[in-house]
């Protein structure tokens, strides 16, 4: 092909590209199409074909130029419909889906790790409470035995000091418990509500509206239940106590802190962790 024909051929390609461009809205697919055409043997064959046409073309004939532009445009449209082009588009969509799934999986794993850590802290805290309960019961027994034997004032003073130390430790523990529940009780009970709604047998039964309940009131109710459970655990036999809030019952059971009365699902009691140690 001589230089004049080559220049003319490039002008036709440029003009045709201007015709195709407004019809192509998806730039990513156009890039894929161009990559496919450049690497495909079909393009070589098309160029050779058009070189022959251009070599016979006279620049003065505008009608012939327009005709060649339309024919080249149709050739490009046919190439876009090539079977080899479709798998590339499909692969691109699959790759995007895989990328989105990986991002979601990573996010879910991070959330799972946070929830596991919170549950671990709650179980550890419950174990500490049980240890304190056992220690308190033992000290009360020792105090009762000493009182019956009528120990001297020095022993009585030691008991008073031990009692004061116990009361101080108990106060510190309950202060920590209050702070923990103030910060985490609403979110923990909200998770328990989600579990209740998921397992609710009747789809038409209305679920409790968590947002309409004061977080402060809910936290205070949760604190009262914990205090009642701890006081109740000191009683021989540790009878079950009634808890009216379904969310609190659900959370205590899911966190393996309490067991439910087989006769009444609204009654619970603390699991004796000290017996398992």
Curated annotation (Swiss-Prot):
<protein>
    <recommendedName>
        <fullName>Inner kinetochore subunit sim4</fullName>
    </recommendedName>
</protein>
<dbReference type="GO" id="GO:0051382">
    <property type="term" value="P:kinetochore assembly"/>
</dbReference>
<feature type="coiled-coil region">
    <location>
        <begin position="96"/>
        <end position="138"/>
    </location>
</feature>
<dbReference type="GO" id="GO:0005634">
    <property type="term" value="C:nucleus"/>
</dbReference>
<dbReference type="GO" id="GO:0000939">
    <property type="term" value="C:inner kinetochore"/>
</dbReference>
<comment type="function">
    <text>Component of the kinetochore, a multiprotein complex that assembles on centromeric DNA and attaches chromosomes to spindle microtubules, mediating chromosome segregation and sister chromatid segregation during meiosis and mitosis. Component of the inner kinetochore constitutive centromere-associated network (CCAN), which serves as a structural platform for outer kinetochore assembly.</text>
</comment>
<keyword id="KW-0131">Cell cycle</keyword>
<keyword id="KW-0137">Centromere</keyword>
<keyword id="KW-0158">Chromosome</keyword>
<dbReference type="GO" id="GO:0031511">
    <property type="term" value="C:Mis6-Sim4 complex"/>
</dbReference>
<dbReference type="Pfam" id="PF11802">
    <property type="entry name" value="CENP-K"/>
</dbReference>
<dbReference type="GO" id="GO:0000070">
    <property type="term" value="P:mitotic sister chromatid segregation"/>
</dbReference>
<comment type="subunit">
    <text>Component of the inner kinetochore constitutive centromere-associated network (CCAN) (also known as central kinetochore Sim4 complex in fission yeast), which is composed of at least cnl2, cnp3, cnp20, fta1, fta2, fta3, fta4, fta6, fta7, mal2, mhf1, mhf2, mis6, mis15, mis17, sim4 and wip1. Interacts with mis6 and dad1.</text>
</comment>
<keyword id="KW-0132">Cell division</keyword>
<dbReference type="GO" id="GO:0005829">
    <property type="term" value="C:cytosol"/>
</dbReference>
<dbReference type="GO" id="GO:0000779">
    <property type="term" value="C:condensed chromosome, centromeric region"/>
</dbReference>
<dbReference type="InterPro" id="IPR020993">
    <property type="entry name" value="Centromere_CenpK"/>
</dbReference>
<dbReference type="GO" id="GO:0051301">
    <property type="term" value="P:cell division"/>
</dbReference>
<keyword id="KW-0175">Coiled coil</keyword>
<comment type="similarity">
    <text>Belongs to the CENP-K/MCM22 family.</text>
</comment>
<keyword id="KW-0539">Nucleus</keyword>
<keyword id="KW-0498">Mitosis</keyword>
